[in-house]
């Protein structure tokens, strides 16, 4: 395994987030989790959310557990994923994808222009 230092402003994905996890758990109890319509991979266990009943506990776990990024990407690829879209400023995740496999198609959406670029790429 290899660790990469990322510039972040919070101790995400570490035990220092346990108090936030407790608060998140209480908030998630107040809302209803809907049935899963689309496959989503949890970075807590690098597997698809099995049911709506497990969503809350996995969301809480991912706050304080290391991200299983490479395993999650591998799972997505083995399940037929052909492209990844990173939404938000920067291209950190697209860069990390290329470290796993330079052939992976990845796109970044951070503004209207990049959204149009991605839309055009998927029209073909």
Predicted regions span which residues?
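Acyl-group transfer acyltransferase/transacylase scaffold of fatty acid/polyketide systems
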Residues: 1-124
């Amino acid at each position: 395994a290899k660790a990469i230092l990322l510039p972040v402003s919070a101790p995400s994905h570490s035990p220092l987030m346990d108090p936030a996890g407790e608060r998140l758990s209480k908030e998630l109890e107040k809302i209803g989790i809907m049935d899963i319509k689309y496959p989503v991979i949890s970075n807590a266990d690098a597997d698809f959310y099995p049911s709506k009943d497990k969503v809350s506990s996995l969301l809480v776990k991912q706050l304080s557990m290391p991200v299983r990024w490479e395993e999650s990407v591998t799972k997505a690829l083995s399940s037929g994923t052909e492209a990844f879209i990173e939404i938000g400023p920067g291209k950190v995740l697209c860069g990390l994808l290329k470290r796993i496999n330079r052939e992976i198609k990845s796109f970044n959406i951070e503004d209207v222009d990049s959204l149009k670029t991605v839309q055009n790429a998927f029209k073909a």
